[in-house]
Amino acid sequence: MNTIVIAPDSFKESMTALQAARAIEKGFRRVIPNANYRLIPMADGGEGTVQSIVDALQGERKVVKVEGPLGDTVEAEYGLSGDRKIAVIEMAQASGLHLVPKEKRNPLWTSTYGTGQLLIDALDEGVEQIILGIGGSATNDGGAGMAQAVGVRLLKENGEPIGKGGGKLKELARIDMSKVDPRIQQVKLQVACDVDNPLVGEKGAAVVYGPQKGATRATIRELDEQLLHFANIIEEELGKEVASIPGAGAAGGLGAGLIAFLDAKLIPGVELVLQATNFHELVKDADFVITGEGRIDQQTVYGKTPIGVAKAAKQYGVPVIAIAGSLGQGYEAVFEHGIDAAFSLVPRIMSLDEAMQQGDSLLEQAARNIAVVSSWNKST
């Protein structure tokens, strides 16, 4: 009996990863009804990661009230695996740019405090592992707010706590780790990070990502200086050099804070999802793998889900087929990275809106056509 692994990412604004996987399975079953199908919803650590892992691990989502980027109360969701041993958190749920109206965006004031509150809530659930995605932030506070929420005391020269936001880092003089929630050291904390920006400098958090968060040129200079001060105090107080670590600048320096205060590991997002879903164990005896996402082009080779899936499958010599909403310029580059064939699900000229509305039926039909060809190979 054929074993077919179906491991797509979401098709943004059209299908979740699980919906896409089910559409592919439905198409294949029209041709190969008795195969052993293994559906593994995937993600790359960014948007949709919580949903994919929750779906793959038969888990659930939990809604909690936390402090938003500007200090107001927001509702944030995170995922728990079915056995409640793994929590999957997207920092954007608590500290994301979408939570701040455009006219109020200013990373001098926004804080990651709510992200730390999500970490504490996960600890209250008794989890053994936390996967944290750190894209889409509204912040540039170096993870200071997150640290304060889990018990790190960031102090001024006079012993009072510093304020919240990227504009308060210059106040930092001392760091007291004695009140950190001890449970944080008992869990495996892994951070999904797909950028290699350092904390400061021309490729740092403020210069590269500050403008999209509402920072002016003057604000960017100030933020960069404050992050450098923050890094210097961390090195003096904790003996950790974080200013130049690749990924430290992710999410406005949250990467640096997670490394400095919580000894977190920064790992490419798709690798984390592969681990969490037990992908390697499920793929090693497969006949072939079907993956895909909304668009495949020359950028797909830079850490996107189909490439992560393909590289993992190729460790076991398993062929990989990708289906995309569209095949963009340079998509052939994926053939050098483990994908054996790539197909578009669009069978004729149609608008983007039409294709997205019909995504599941188009994906099912494309999968059916691929299944026909694969069955020819088995019968010859």
UniProtKB/Swiss-Prot annotation:
It catalyses: (R)-glycerate + ATP = (2R)-3-phosphoglycerate + ADP + H(+). It is an enzyme of class 2 (transferase). Pfam families: Gly_kinase. Its EC number is 2.7.1.31. Keywords: ATP-binding, Kinase, Nucleotide-binding, Transferase. Disulfide bonds: none annotated. Gene3D superfamilies: Glycerate kinase, domain 1, Glycerate kinase, domain 2. InterPro entries: Glyc_kinase_flavodox-like_fold, Glycerate_kinase, Glycerate_kinase_RE-like, Glycerate_kinase_sf. One of its GO terms (molecular function) is ATP binding. GO terms for biological process: organic acid phosphorylation. Belongs to the glycerate kinase type-1 family. This is Glycerate kinase. It comes from Halalkalibacterium halodurans (strain ATCC BAA-125 / DSM 18197 / FERM 7344 / JCM 9153 / C-125) (Bacillus halodurans).
